[in-house]
Amino acid sequence: MAEKTQKSVKIAPGAVVCVESEIRGDVTIGPRTVIHPKARIIAEAGPIIIGEGNLIEEQALIINAHPDNIIPDTEDTEPKPMIIGTNNVFEVGCHSQAMKMGDNNVIESKAYVGRNVILTSGCIIGACCSLNTFEAIPENTVIYGADCLRRVQTERPQPQTLQLDFLMKILPNYHHLKKTMKGSSTPVKN
């Protein structure tokens, strides 16, 4: 029989997480975060902590995976948490392995952010851009175009509060939601 290691998924009150999303491993989801159907959040190499007010759209993949040169369970690897700040947007079909992400970032459709990239705050990774460097992206950087050109914007992207409010109202009408955590962590006996 397959090994059953269902790690904990903690969903804060006020978060909207559709049942059709795939969440594996030790994942903590903050309040006012919206996770669409078909979004995937996979914590293999350590926990994933998602802050408040994030929007994770369809077919977005957020994965805390083992680096390519490490074979799990054979080497003594310390689990490293992936930390995602507040008010970030993961658009349709994006792929993020960034271990540390600040606030107010946007990863646009089909964009890829590698494991060794640190996104500070206010950054936009443009559609179809691939970023797999060993660097911390400076605040308010926009990476765009087929050549992944860079520039710095004067203001950081606006939080998607109106869109989050709309989705929190509409998604429960059309999708089943995963249950959020209650005040106590002990199971209730019938």
UniProtKB/Swiss-Prot annotation:
It is found in: Cytoplasm, Cytoskeleton; Chromosome, Centromere, Kinetochore. GO terms for biological process: lipid biosynthetic process; mitochondrion organization; mitotic spindle organization. Keywords: Centromere, Chromosome, Cytoplasm, Cytoskeleton, Kinetochore, Phosphoprotein. Subunit of dynactin, a multiprotein complex part of a tripartite complex with dynein and a adapter, such as BICDL1, BICD2 or HOOK3. The dynactin complex is built around ACTR1A/ACTB filament and consists of an actin-related filament composed of a shoulder domain, a pointed end and a barbed end. Its length is defined by its flexible shoulder domain. The soulder is composed of 2 DCTN1 subunits, 4 DCTN2 and 2 DCTN3. The 4 DCNT2 (via N-terminus) bind the ACTR1A filament and act as molecular rulers to determine the length. The pointed end is important for binding dynein-dynactin cargo adapters. This is Dynactin subunit 6. Belongs to the dynactin subunits 5/6 family. Dynactin subunit 6 subfamily. The keyword Cytoplasm applies. SUPFAM superfamilies: Trimeric LpxA-like enzymes (SSF51161). The lineage of its organism: Eukaryota, Metazoa, Chordata, Craniata, Vertebrata. Induction: Up-regulated in Ant1-deficient mice. Disulfide bonds: none annotated. Its main location: cytoplasm. The modification Phosphothreonine is found at residue 186. It comes from the Eukaryota. PANTHER family: DYNACTIN 6, DYNACTIN SUBUNIT 6. Part of the dynactin complex that activates the molecular motor dynein for ultra-processive transport along microtubules. GO terms for molecular function: catalytic activity; dynein complex binding. Phosphorylation at Thr-186 by CDK1 during mitotic prometaphase creates a binding site for PLK1 that facilitates its recruitment to kinetochores. One of its GO terms (cellular component) is dynactin complex.
